[in-house]
Design a protein with these regions (language model features):
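Double-stranded RNA-binding/processing signature
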Residues: 1-310
Length: 310
């Protein structure tokens, strides 16, 4: 009865007991062999690189030259690998000048500069009171290798990049995305490249607090500096109220004022923590980056601010 339940009910009819043993043996062999080595996508028989490039241009709605896109997806390591193979084969062409394509370093520089200029312009437009140091910190976050590599991988560039390893490194993914922006600039103009940056890079700020991206180490010092630049008196901290002072759950609420004018307030477990958080709240109010401020309106960005004003 036990055998009948084991082989007859769970794994099919009793006559198919060999099937269970056969599959179990295959499974053990698969575990002993280990994972398959990583292979290039081009090693598979159904790979058509030209078709993939053509599909890429239509996926983003861009009219790009296929050769320009091919260069944008070619990493410098791939070029070195080709030159090395040709040299080992004894061919006369041992330098990249004789090859029909080039790497994406120059396009990547152009694309990164376009993205940086546009992001700073867009952030200045929507956050006019935000300091330049904060704008640069947000731009640096958006153009960081981890952010751009994540965007590039999500856009499907991972299988399009030609490099010397099966899985492109984050640096390769970053260069490919910047080179793609540079290729758009060369083929259809800077305005289309900026639209791409707005659609796929600037939107990375959705759901994020820019006040947390810019790490201010001394908020009270920055608040004092901002008030002095605007001709206002230095900030003054005042304890509004406290509760549970003699317990482990003590709470203090501190307000920040300038010439009896309320700037901000916050709570904290200690007076120093509450004072620091109150200074940060005052900075948010002065820079107009508090929670009441809406996210970047991309419809206004397209119509009024930047992209159509060319």
């Amino acid at each position: 009865m036990v055998r009948l339940l084991r082989y007859g009910t769970i794994f099919g009819p009793l006559k198919d007991r060999w099937r269970y043993l056969y599959k179990r043996d295959l499974y053990k062999r698969r575990l002993e062999a280990g994972p398959e080595p990583e292979r290039f996508r081009s090693a598979l028989i159904n790979w058509n690189y030209d078709a993939e490039l053509y599909a890429c241009t239509h996926r983003f709605g861009e009219k790009l030259n296929i050769e320009s896109l091919r260069n944008a997806m070619t990493d410098a390591s791939f070029l070195k690998q080709i030159v090395k193979q040709r040299t080992e084969a004894g061919l006369a062409a041992t330098d990249q000048t004789t090859l029909a394509f080039t790497h994406n370093q120059e396009l990547a520089k152009q694309g990164k500069q376009i993205a940086e200029d546009f992001l700073q312009k867009a952030l200045h437009y929507w956050y006019p009171k935000f300091p330049q140091e904060g704008i640069e910190a947000i731009t640096k976050f958006l153009l960081s290798e981890s952010t751009i590599a994540d965007i590039s991988s999500g856009l499907g560039f991972k299988t399009l990049i030609r490099c010397d390893i099966p899985s492109p490194r984050p640096t390769m993914l970053t260069n490919a995305l910047f080179a793609f922006i540079g290729s758009i600039n060369e083929n259809t103009g800077r305005s289309r490249a900026e639209v791409f940056v707005a659609d796929f890079i600037l939107t990375h700020l959705v759901g994020k607090d820019i006040n947390e991206i810019w790490q201010v180490k001394n908020p009270m010092g920055l608040l004092t500096k901002v008030l002095e630049e605007n001709g206002r008196q230095a900030p003054e901290s005042r304890l509004i109220w406290a509760t549970g002072v003699s317990s482990v759950l003590s709470t203090y609420v501190v307000g920040v004022y300038s010439n009896k004018e309320f700037l901000g307030k916050s709570a904290g477990a200690t007076v120093s923590i509450a004072e620091e958080m109150a200074a940060r709240d005052a900075l948010r109010r002065l820079f107009e980056t508090d929670e009441k401020r809406a996210q970047i309106p991309f419809d206004k960005l397209y119509k009024k601010g930047l992209l159509l004003d060319k």
